[in-house]
Structures are given as C-alpha cells and as structure tokens.
Amino acid sequence: MPAIYYVPGRGGRLNSGLGLELSARGYDLIGREIAGPGPRDQSNPFASLSFQQQVEVIQHDLQTHFWTPEALVIGNSFGAYLIAHSILQLGNFPGKCLFLSPVLGAVKTTGMLFKPPKSGVLKDAIENRSFPLIILDILAGSTDEHLLPVEAEQLSDQTNGSLSIIEGQGHQIEPLIIKAKLDAWLD
C-alpha cells in the first residue's frame, strides 16, 4: 500500500487520531511526532531537536522517501508549519500536500501572543509570493484562533490546490469533516 508522510501537531501521535484513520484506509505512515511535555523532551529525540534541526530532518525524510509526484504529505497544526518551512527552504516539492488547521505564523490568542520560530520568514515568503509552487490543499476552521485567514488565502492563491475554511469549526475540526476531506484528497 502507498505511504503517507504525516507530521501531527504538538502532542499528536502517528498511531492515534488522524494517524489511525489513515492506517485504517490502508496507508503506511511515515512521519515525525512533536510529542512530549516540552521542546527538550528526551523521550522523543525529534522533539528534543531545535526548530531548524527538525526542519532539516523533515527535508531529509521528504527527499529520501517522498520525492516523487505521487508523494502524499499531511501536516496538522504545528506539523504543517514545520513542513511549510521545510518546503520553503528546499525551494520545491514534487508531491501533494494537505495542511489541516495549519499554524502559519504569529497570532494573538486569548490574551497571549503565540509566535512560532521563524514566523517572519514564512510570512515574508507568503506576502512576497516566493513560497514554492506546490500542490497544497488547506482545511481550517473559521473559529480557529490559530488561523491567519489572510495568510492562508495568500498561500492558497500561490499554490496549486484549494483552501476550505469550515464555518463554526475551531482548531480541532470534527472527524467527519476531516474524513470527507480525505475522501476527496486521496481520490
């Protein structure tokens, strides 16, 4: 069966949630987990790496195992952010990507500023239309406090794919909506 490269969000696992759904559909999963209580969690070597090291590991994974037009890559939340930076630094990607509830940069949420590493670099690439032309579908919820709708629309406009913002959905999009998107995306 074909493989999917999947990077879940912080705390997400390859063997639960979306990972289980993809496995149930017969796909082999390869990916990286950003799980653990903190960025220096020793129980997960990938999570203990710096941001740039994580990006470089994902670049290596993509170039080694998924550098074909048939490649399928999924990023959820911060996992999408890592994949976006990986592809930005690589300059292109021949496969197909799906970002679910993607983190695309700094955002003020419920009284605090969430500013992921190198958020200005990704923002500049999106605003300057220098993000690589890839096949990218984005699915996000309209009430997701991590969603940057302008950046999501700009990114979608400069890539081959689609942007779907689901009314009334937050950062955790209902599983039935995700399944319907997977049905179309994997077809």
Model-derived regions, located:
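Serine-hydrolase catalytic machinery in alpha/beta-hydrolase-like enzymes
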Residues: 2-71, 81-85, 127
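Conserved alpha/beta-hydrolase fold motif
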Residues: 73-74, 97
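Active-site loop->helix "elbow" adjoining a glycine-rich segment at hydrolase catalytic centers
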Residues: 76-80
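Active-site nucleophile loop of the alpha/beta-hydrolase fold
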Residues: 34, 98-107
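Catalytic histidine-centered segment of alpha/beta-hydrolase-like enzymes
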Residues: 169-179
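Conserved alpha/beta-hydrolase "acid-adjacent" motif
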Residues: 145-151, 174
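Short beta-strand/loop motif that positions the catalytic acidic residue
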Residues: 132, 137-140, 152
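Conserved hydrolase catalytic core segment
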Residues: 85-96, 105
